[in-house]
Amino acid sequence: MKKILLTLALAIPAFSQTSIKDALAKHWKVTGDFTIAVAKLMPADQYGFRPVPIELSFGQLMVQVGGANLNACALASGMTRPAVPTKLSDALKDEKIDIDKDTAVKFLSDSFDFCNQAVASMTPEKLDAVAGTTRKMTGFEWLWSYFTHTAHHRGQAEVYLRIKGIKPPDYVF
């Protein structure tokens, strides 16, 4: 009986361990929901706001996150990257073009949906495979580096909200 209990005591923690893929899937979902919540808090008439002229507007910042998500998740997974609508790609090249809230939030949401699908499709081999043309990283590195990229820009967006007197959502992880 003692051997059985000892075996179970040692085996049960192994069953509860989370795989890297599961952890990535969980955190991509959380960071997506959190980032979209930040995006939705900015009033539509403030999507062109920039704290200083050299910074991206709030709308451009949200679209920049979405575009980077598409690139990273496509490279990591091997899935075909969805096309970026012309209006949005033009706005990222020309900072004088405004991006409206509905368009930005939809694009951002769609980018996280794509990333959630991409992460779900990943095999251990894909996580370890090197991908990229000019910048080569493993699938895991693409996902993790752009996870942190999203956090960086979400932090900027939270400052934009605070400048406008809007309290960002509480931090979640």
Predicted regions and their residues:
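Sec-dependent N-terminal signal peptides
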Residues: K3-P13
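Short, contiguous alpha-helical
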Residues: A25, K29, D33-I36, Q46-D90, ...
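Acidic/histidine-rich alpha-helical segments that form the ligand environment
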Residues: K93-V130, E141-H149
